[in-house]
Amino acid sequence: MDVEQKKPLIESSDRNLPDFKKSVKLKYVKLGYHYLITHGMYLFLSPLVLVIAAQISTFSVTDLRSLWEHLQYNLISVVVCSMLLVFLMTIYFMTRPRPVYLVNFSCFKPDESRKCTKKIFMDRSKLTGSFTEENLEFQRKILQRSGLGESTYLPEAVLNVPPNPCMKEARKEAETVMFGAIDELLAKTNVNPKDIGILIVNCSLFNPTPSLSAMVVNHYKLRGNILSYNLGGMGCSAGLISIDLAKHLLHSIPNTYAMVISMENITLNWYFGNDRSKLVSNCLFRMGGAAILLSNKRWDRRRSKYELVDTVRTHKGADDKCFGCITQEEDSASKIGVTLSKELMAVAGDALKTNITTLGPLVLPTSEQLLFFATLVGRKLFKMKIKPYIPDFKLAFEHFCIHAGGRAVLDELEKNLKLTEWHMEPSRMTLYRFGNTSSSSLWYELAYSEAKGRIKKGDRIWQIAFGSGFKCNSSVWRAVRSVNPKKEKNPWMDEIHEFPVEVPKVSTI
């Protein structure tokens, strides 16, 4: 057993997220309330309609007869009011956004032959002859503390001896992941591929020609007028960007389906150099992907799992430090890799702070909003020396799907948001079982909650992810129905009885 090193791999000040609740800018709170007011018409009209209905229900027959006689003598007023009512109702039905339902989703589970234990990872890394002994030791220590288990997956091109990363193998990995997830999704939903009107594929680091979305169109012979999008270079939060894009398209195009595929490609993005800031990605990222089917057809509600409540996107790219904290570049030996800067955790904390400050007014109960806002105004405007109030997001959500980017980030989010081990379990178990699957990790986490039988009708789910750019994005879902795990097919079902497991702080290899 190795002796634990005295000095941490990353300095504490760089490793920990800042206490983002202690520094909140009023403009982000204002933005959140702007979103609330924009969608607040329905909130204010609903009680008014209920009051009018309650008042009418108290009328006696004599009152109704008297009202009818009064209307007969004011026919012009009745006609004008009726026309105005019809006009307002028409405007309401024409302008209200169409609901966006998540019919179902699927997560790809690779074959057993692609499993990669920590020992296999270290053995293959050594056999490449690319890494110095010091950097092999560095990777071993990162891997020991990563939170990954012994059953994550890597593509064949990386596991082969010697490795053979090439365009052919990268396409093979992409097709395996995408088509595997889509085949399962179509089988679950019984949707004809020709009925899909919108296709969005996001993959940050692999963008071939023809595009990944074109590969899907060709393989499934999708219709010629499909709206096809291929998002690249947008990092681990790209999955929620795809959901947000699909939402806006579904709000403007009636009666159609949108299919979203979120994945990352490992084959051509394995780093074979000795720059330590690029080696961390090798230790964390693993093979995986997800396919999601969305619908704006109102009759699909009865068979859908979730309804999209809201999305909030935050982009910090205007700040140079944020923009450059995750960069794909060449090292001194001209080998390409993804650099993770020391400022990453601080940047992530700032983006997260902005995102949840904007999201808060949309989801938090009124009591929490008032306490949070009053404390904020007191501290910012009146310079009062009072302790900042940390809203309890557990009052707004029953389930949390936090991007499984790494153990340190999950630890800090658990502490800052005051979440319990139960709330963090889907994220930690996803990181342990599948590793960092980039933008698709959120869906493995939701699948975990479903497999555990936790999703009940009316439950609210918060998905939050962050990635290069720097971006932090959130989506909020409400369960349309309870999910029966016995009827589910997802990558956890055949082994869910083994989880949760205790993940050691430092594992042995």
Curated annotation (Swiss-Prot):
Cellular compartment(s): Membrane
- Identify the pathway: Lipid metabolism; fatty acid biosynthesis
Positions of the catalytic residues: C236, H315, H399, H403, N436
Q: Which SUPFAM superfamilies match?
A: Thiolase-like (SSF53901)
Q: How does the record say this protein sits in the membrane?
A: Multi-pass membrane protein
Q: Which reaction does it catalyse?
A: a very-long-chain acyl-CoA + malonyl-CoA + H(+) = a very-long-chain 3-oxoacyl-CoA + CO2 + CoA
Predominantly, its location class is membrane
* Annotated tissue distribution: Only expressed in guard cells. Expressed in siliques, flowers, leaves, stems, roots and seedlings.
- Gene Ontology terms: biological process: fatty acid biosynthetic process; response to cold; response to light stimulus
Keywords, A to Z, come to: Acyltransferase, Membrane, NAD, NADP, Transferase, Transmembrane, Transmembrane helix
Q: Which family does it belong to?
A: Belongs to the thiolase-like superfamily. Chalcone/stilbene synthases family.
Q: What does this protein do?
A: Active on both saturated and mono-unsaturated acyl chains C16 to C20.
The cross-references to PANTHER family, in alphabetical order and at most eight, read:
3-KETOACYL-COA SYNTHASE (PTHR31561)
Q: What is this protein called?
A: 3-ketoacyl-CoA synthase 11
Q: Which organism is it from?
A: Arabidopsis thaliana (Mouse-ear cress)
